[in-house]
C-alpha cells in the first residue's frame, strides 16, 4: 500500500522506471480513463474501447480519435480551420 501513495495506480510498477515516468503515466492514464461527452447524443458516456477507438456507452456511436483523448489538441485546430 505504501508504494501507491504518490503515484496511485502507477504504483503497480513498483520501483521500476523511476518516479518521473510513473507520474507522467499517471497523468496520461487519468485523461485516458475518464468519460467524455458524446458528439451524437450529448451524454457523458464516451469511453476508450481500443487504441484510438472511442465508443459511447449510451447510444453506441463509435468513432476514431486520439490515442489518449477523443479529440486531440491538433484535431481541434484542424476542426476550427475547416469548419
From Swiss-Prot:
Its cofactor is Zn(2+). One of its GO terms (biological process) is translation. GO terms for molecular function: large ribosomal subunit rRNA binding; structural constituent of ribosome; zinc ion binding. GO terms for cellular component: ribonucleoprotein complex; ribosome. It comes from the Archaea. Zn(2+) binds at residues 38, 41, 56, 59. Pfam families: Ribosomal_L37ae (PF01780). A zinc finger (C4-type) spans 38-59. The keyword Ribonucleoprotein applies. InterPro entries: Ribosomal_eL37/eL43, Ribosomal_eL43, Ribosomal_protein_eL43, Ribosomal_zn-bd. PANTHER family: 60S RIBOSOMAL PROTEIN L37A, LARGE RIBOSOMAL SUBUNIT PROTEIN EL43. Belongs to the eukaryotic ribosomal protein eL43 family. Putative zinc-binding subfamily. Part of the 50S ribosomal subunit. This is Large ribosomal subunit protein eL43. It comes from Archaeoglobus fulgidus (strain ATCC 49558 / DSM 4304 / JCM 9628 / NBRC 100126 / VC-16). The gene is rpl37ae.
Amino acid at each position: 500500500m505504501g508504494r501507491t501513495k504518490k503515484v496511485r495506480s502507477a504504483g503497480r510498477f513498483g520501483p521500476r522506471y523511476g518516479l518521473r515516468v510513473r507520474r507522467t503515466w499517471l497523468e496520461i492514464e487519468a485523461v485516458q480513463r475518464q468519460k467524455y461527452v458524446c458528439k451524437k447524443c450529448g451524454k457523458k458516456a464516451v469511453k476508450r474501447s481500443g487504441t484510438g477507438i472511442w465508443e459511447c456507452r449510451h447510444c453506441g456511436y463509435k468513432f476514431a480519435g486520439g490515442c489518449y483523448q477523443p479529440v486531440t489538441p491538433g484535431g481541434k485546430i484542424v476542426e476550427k480551420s475547416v469548419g
